[in-house]
Swiss-Prot record:
Species classification: Bacteria, Pseudomonadati, Pseudomonadota, Alphaproteobacteria, Sphingomonadales
The protein's annotated pathway: Amino-acid biosynthesis; L-arginine biosynthesis; N(2)-acetyl-L-ornithine from L-glutamate: step 2/4
This protein's name: Acetylglutamate kinase
Signal peptide: none
Origin species: Rhizorhabdus wittichii (strain DSM 6014 / CCUG 31198 / JCM 15750 / NBRC 105917 / EY 4224 / RW1)
GO molecular function list: acetylglutamate kinase activity; ATP binding
Gene3D superfamilies hit by this protein: Acetylglutamate kinase-like (3.40.1160.10)
């Protein structure tokens, strides 16, 4: 018979993790975390379960999580099924009336309710809504220009029903959070003209984070964070450093608008924004509750 009474090393590790997390839990109790969950991060059911468990845990330790989700790939798939061609300008989907209807159907009727269901299965209570509900997010039309290659003249491009938040009424989210539930927001908004507008999910999350005075804005995506020229993760950045990395070409492509959202958020009063890989198990908890963190944290320095 074994006389070894030493604790299980795995249990010790778990206990040490909790001890390390405690000061962070105390620090963030009562604060708001806005979490943007990208459409590209939704493909793995196991990762979806991990995400839902993380959100429920945040709520359980006294943090108020607010989920804003994307759904670009899913919208594109539905449009293809319906025989509707997708066209993009500066990464924004050109949205005519038919595309706007499809986007609202996919985002509000499918993805939003799926995330609410994940959270319920993880033991939480979530309420799905869009920016249209209670006129929570009023959008204004996004305007873009493109240089004509023949005339070399900048010309206006009509993106259709693509909007950006002009005004946010936080009362709907506050009411849900104070009731002990978790708001899950689809990036659809109402315009002053009464039309429905499709809003970039990163932009929506950043605007909501500013309106709520969030402690953290998390952008969960399918990359580890911001990488340097050697493809190594950059753990901390300030707006000034981001400008320098853009100028020398280190930051390119789709990472630029994400960082613009982060900079806008921290300049608007959000304590910090983080870009991290939503496919990594419990990456958000690692970022929030450990010294090392995960992903790239953007702050004012």
């Amino acid at each position: 018979m074994s006389t070894d009474h030493s604790p299980d090393p795995l249990l010790l590790t778990k206990a040490e993790t909790l001890v390390e997390a405690l000061p962070y839990m105390q620090r963030y109790a009562g604060e708001t975390f806005v979490v943007k969950y990208g459409g590209h991060a939704m493909g793995d059911p196991e990762a979806a379960r991990d995400f839902a468990e993380d959100i429920v845990l945040l709520k359980a330790v006294g943090i108020n999580p607010v989920v804003v989700h994307g759904g670009g790939p899913q919208i594109g798939k539905m449009l293809k099924t319906l025989g509707v061609e997708s066209r993009f300008v500066d990464g924004l989907r050109v949205t005519d009336a038919e595309t706007a209807r499809v986007a609202e159907m996919v985002l509000c009727g499918s993805i939003n309710k799926e995330i609410v269901s994940w959270i319920a299965q993880a033991g939480g209570r979530a309420v799905g809504l869009s920016g249209k509900d209670g006129r929570m997010v009023v959008a204004e039309k996004v305007r873009r220009t493109q240089r004509d290659p023949d005339s070399n003249i900048e010309k206006a491009v009509d993106l259709g029903f693509v909007g950006e938040p002009a005004d946010i009424d936080r009362r709907v989210i506050d009411t849900i959070s104070k009731a002990g539930m978790i708001p899950v927001v689809a990036p659809i908004a109402i315009g002053e003209d009464g039309h429905t507008y499709n809003v970039n999910a990163d932009t929506m999350a950043g605007a909501i984070a500013i309106a709520l005075g969030a402690a953290r804005l998390f952008l969960l995506t399918d990359v580890a964070g911001v990488l340097d020229k050697e493809k190594k993760l950059i753990r901390d950045l300030t707006p000034r450093q981001i400008n320098a990395l853009r100028e020398d070409g280190t930051i390119q492509g789709g990472m630029i608008p994400k960082l613009e959202t982060c900079v806008h958020a921290v300049e608007g009063g959000v304590d910090a924004a983080v870009i991290l890989d939503g496919r990594v198990p419990h990456a958000m908890l690692i970022e929030a509750f450990t010294r090392r963190g995960a992903g790239t944290l953007i702050g004012m320095g």
